[in-house]
């Protein structure tokens, strides 16, 4: 059975979608990744574009509240990974059954300024950094998945 992972960022607009898509792509035989936000916003088109460069399409993804995920109790998560600032992460609900809670800090693409090309370049950099973290996570945890 696949272990479930929930990635959380503030608006569920970029970082958490990027991480969930990359984990499902890289290690989907072991994990089922989901994403949510503290205050769901709109899916960031730069995140969509940056992942399309890797052949991953998240254009149909919807944003959702971590509190709605928590209240629905549809999933028992083995890992909850926050991707916002530590102080923002403290506002996340406690999920029953969570084996491990991790915090990965990455810049928010919604806060990038400049031209479209400059913001896309910075977003691609965030995607690369998240991708490296996902690769490390898979190397570390795939060996422990039954």
What is the meaning of each model-derived region?
Residues 37, 84, 105-107:
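Residues at the C-termini of beta-strands that transition into short coil/loop
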Residues 73-97:
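Mid-chain, well-packed structural core segment of small domains
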Residues 1-71:
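Conserved active-site segments centered on acidic
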Residues 88-146:
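Phosphate-binding/catalytic loops
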């Amino acid at each position: 059975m696949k272990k479930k992972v929930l990635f959380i960022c503030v608006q569920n607009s970029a970082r958490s979608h990027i991480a969930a898509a990359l984990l499902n792509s890289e290690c989907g035989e072991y994990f089922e990744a989901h994403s949510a936000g503290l205050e769901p916003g709109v899916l960031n088109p730069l995140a969509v574009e940056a992942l399309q460069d890797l052949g991953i399409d998240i254009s149909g993804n919807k944003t959702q509240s971590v509190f709605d995920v928590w209240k629905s109790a549809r999933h028992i998560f083995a890992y909850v990974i926050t991707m916002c600032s530590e102080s923002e992460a403290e506002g996340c609900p406690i999920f029953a059954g969570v084996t491990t809670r991790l915090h990965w800090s990455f810049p928010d693409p919604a806060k990038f300024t400049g031209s479209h090309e400059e913001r896309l370049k910075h977003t691609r950099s965030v995607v690369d950094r998240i991708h490296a973290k996902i690769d490390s996570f898979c190397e570390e945890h795939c060996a422990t998945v039954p």
